[in-house]
């Protein structure tokens, strides 16, 4: 939210800001005094659950960005940022990937400096996201698994295990829904939303694949363990363990996929969100 300050400082009385992440909601309300509401995204219904025809073991529908530098390069002194604050926040978050960038700023410099310093953290945050996405994908590839990815951005992925990356042409949202219907496992990596979910989570479930995602408070609180598989982004070996277990045990995979589908189709379609939005508007008007 700090990167869109002009939007939040000019909100009209009565306007509502919908946020996909609970932390963002709190930030906007506390810093800007706006009326922000936690409103997670949802997915597109793509048909009834069907486990037939799943020819793709693992898919990830998302963009790749090469990390600016790695934590090892930072620790060695080979690379760094322009300011002490940026370097200290980068060091704190890479030491504990469960932290949000906002949490690190407050812990190091206090809440009073949060709005000021968050404006300088865009590339710090982006580099952290890009690094952990790269690390997770590379760890899976290094274990011998192949991942189907989509779009030319993945041609920039460099690793000793790149041969296990299957790059397909770019696809749109409707095509992604059909890809999930052909997949056994769909991967999700959050863009450091520690209290939210993505549309991709819902789309994977609605496609009947097992969703494996790095954990957030929202996912832990709104899904059961038999509906989604969660791992710590700083421990990608957990991701490999989960993939290994699911691909070896069709009964387990089918059970989780079907349970996730049922949860998503009843609570996490865009139709569900439209109903919730209309109710929210009614409550605000009343």
Predicted regions and their residues:
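A conserved, positively charged/aromatic
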Residues: 5-17
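Catalytic binding pocket for nucleotide-activated donors in carbohydrate/polymer assembly enzymes
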Residues: 22, 26-35, 39, 44, ...
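Nucleotide-sugar donor-binding catalytic core of glycosyltransferases
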Residues: 30-194, 216-218
